[in-house]
Swiss-Prot record:
One of its GO terms (molecular function) is zinc ion binding. Binds 1 zinc or iron ion per subunit. It catalyses: 4-imidazolone-5-propanoate + H2O = N-formimidoyl-L-glutamate. 4-imidazolone-5-propanoate binds at R75, Y138, H171, Q239, T316. One of its GO terms (cellular component) is cytoplasm. This is Imidazolonepropionase. Catalyzes the hydrolytic cleavage of the carbon-nitrogen bond in imidazolone-5-propanoate to yield N-formimidoyl-L-glutamate. It is the third step in the universal histidine degradation pathway. Transmembrane segments: none annotated. The keyword Oxidoreductase does not apply. Its EC number is 3.5.2.7.
Length: 401
């Protein structure tokens, strides 16, 4: 079915810029964009349906390219403890921190995990998100990593959103592998990843390269295994220290390296050469009250694509609004509204290996877009919270969230 969407202004985000088209129209054919441009240039169209967007600003559907949406339990109690003066070390010694999320996730059924994740996902969808990445990493054994990834696939099959599943088994050491990191990496490479990939549950492989997680040498073994399984890689890197993880990611042509507060200019040069996207996570920066800013000047100087994401997770970024992250990126990292919007559209699609089909409004791409009742595109990163008036279109069909 062909639909004409008329009477709008468009920030198409082609090439990562606003690429504004005033007084515009879009023609969709099924799930794809067939024509886009100034309405005055549109020949008398043949269409089955005509929708007047009432002068709205249209952007690509937002893409949340780094989330940990599926988990059991809730760590708001720890949040309260920390603000009462209890240290993270004390919380961890008492069984809190990531260990508590692993226990809760292992104890939860697949249906329970689905129900809680679906509630969180709904908040993102109401914010204009049409594509989301979700990671495993709170199971840390084959049975429970499989359970999380099955929930992720189920969410993608039942909710009005495109979902990419990332296996983050190399997230932390499970209790049964305490002080045996190399053995756990062997287990991931020899058993977990091959089994999960064979079941079709994995779109990409991630790891956490940090002094409190896994070394670059251990991460490299995970990357080698991912390559043997023909799976692209991503990496949590340089969040708390500089270990060269982002350069390692670049050597393996990673889709993205994420966090990056402690990355160096040499890391930026390597990422630019590899086309690896820098995914910045202002929610975690804010929630942890970090002070080391990502090296924005180096990223810009060397042309590293920059994406923004919620990092939705129970411990360090319980963020349910991607639009709020736009404001945080502008305010905390001094990104421009145009850069920030590119970070949740054009560059976010790159970070998921989806730039051929998603991330900008161009002929032949998937017709995922949002018609916002705003005065200008910068409004998306300006307003703090709230539910902006909008119409969400996914695969050429208006979606009711």
């Amino acid at each position: 079915m062909k639909t004409l969407w008329k009477h709008c202004h468009i920030a198409s985000m082609a090439h990562g810029k606003y690429s504004i088209i005033e007084d515009a129209a879009i023609v969709t054919s099924g799930a794809l964009i067939e024509w886009i441009g100034p309405q005055a240039e549109l020949a008398e169209p043949e269409h089955d349906n005509c929708i007047d967007l009432g002068g709205a600003w249209v952007t690509p559907g937002l893409i949340d390219c780094h989330t940990h949406t599926v988990f059991g339990g809730n760590r708001s109690g720890e949040f309260e403890q920390r603000l009462q003066g209890v240290s993270y070390a004390e919380i961890a010694a008492a069984g809190g921190g990531i260990a508590s999320t692993v226990r809760a996730t292992r104890a939860a059924s697949e249906d329970e995990l689905y129900a809680s994740a679906e509630r969180r996902l709904r908040h993102l969808l109401k914010d204009g998100v049409t594509t989301v990445e979700m990671k495993s990493g709170y199971g840390l054994d084959l049975e429970n990593e499989r359970k999380i990834l099955r929930v992720i696939r189920r969410l993608g099959n039942t909710q009005p959103v495109t979902v990419r599943a990332t296996c983050l088994a190399a997230h932390a050491l499970p209790p049964e592998y305490a002080d045996r990191a190399d053995d756990f990496i062997n287990h991931i490479c020899n058993e977990m990843l091959p089994a999960l990939a064979a079941e079709g549950l994995v779109d990409a492989v991630d790891a956490f390269c940090e002094y409190l997680a896994f070394s670059p040498e251990q991460v490299e073994r995970v990357f080698i295994t991912a390559g043997q399984l023909a799976l692209p890689v991503k990496l949590h890197a340089e969040q708390l220290s500089s270990l060269g993880g982002s350069s390692l990611a670049a050597r393996y042509n990673a889709l993205s390296a994420d966090h990056l507060e402690f990355m160096t200019e040499d890391d930026a040069i390597a990422m630019a050469a590899a086309g690896t996207v820098a995914v910045l996570l202002p929610g975690a920066f804010y929630f942890l009250r970090e002070t080391q800013l990502p090296p924005m000047d180096a990223l810009r100087k060397h042309g590293v694509p920059i994406a923004i994401s919620t990092d939705l997770n129970p411990g360090t970024s319980p963020g349910l609004s991607l639009r709020l992250m736009l404001n945080m990126a502008c305010t905390l990292f001094r990104m421009t509204p145009e850069e920030a919007l590119a970070g949740v559209t054009f560059n976010a699609a790159k970070a998921l290996g989806m730039s051929a089909t998603h991330g900008s409004l161009e002929v032949g791409k998937v017709a995922d877009f949002v018609a916002w009742n705003i005065e200008r595109p910068a409004d998306l990163g300006y307003w703090l919270g709230g539910d902006l008036d909008k119409r969400i279109v996914r695969h050429g069909v208006e979606s009711s969230i």
